[in-house]
């Protein structure tokens, strides 16, 4: 389970935290909790959806304790591999956190709307609207870049 899902969970953690060290800590805690609660896992969703849900809760818990900032650091290289260019990466980084979460899950990790909905514990309609707003904002930013 760890081998198949560590990259996805790490990409998600990096996308929603401001610090690669915090993301690493969140990923470790995610897999510790997953191991602890494995007997309660129901196959109603995929393992990655379940792990992303755990990771999101871990990051929220850590943010309450450590007041994690929303912006991504400049030196995060791992998640850049998922984007076609640094410009697009920077545009995604500027999205509000709720939109960024949906973009990471759907566009990068390949979640369908239902899986993203389960992972983020929000309605499917909210996933769709956040993704639509993110696409609209990214489109505007891309138009601005292309106009230069």
Where in the sequence are the language-model features?
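DNA-recognition helix of helix-turn-helix
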Residues: 60, 120-148
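Internal acidic/polar
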Residues: 61, 66-92, 112, 147
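Residues within helix-turn-helix
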Residues: 21, 114, 125
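Arg/Lys-rich amphipathic alpha helix in sigma70-family domain 2
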Residues: 40-43, 52-73, 133
């Amino acid at each position: 389970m760890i081998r198949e899902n560590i990259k996805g969970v790490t990409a998600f953690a990096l996308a929603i935290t401001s610090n690669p060290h915090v993301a690493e800590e969140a990923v470790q805690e995610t897999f510790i909790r997953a191991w602890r609660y494995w007997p309660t896992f129901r196959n109603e969703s995929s393992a990655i959806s379940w792990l992303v849900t755990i990771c999101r809760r871990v990051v929220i818990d850590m943010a309450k304790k450590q007041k994690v900032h929303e912006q991504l650091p400049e030196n995060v290289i791992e998640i850049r591999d998922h984007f076609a260019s640094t410009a697009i990466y920077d545009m995604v980084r500027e999205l509000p956190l709720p939109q960024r979460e949906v973009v990471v899950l759907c566009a990068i990790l390949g979640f369908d709307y239902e899986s993203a909905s389960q992972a983020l514990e929000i309605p499917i309609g909210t996933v769709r609207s956040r993704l639509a707003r993110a696409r609209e904002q990214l489109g505007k930013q891309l138009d601005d870049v292309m106009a230069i």
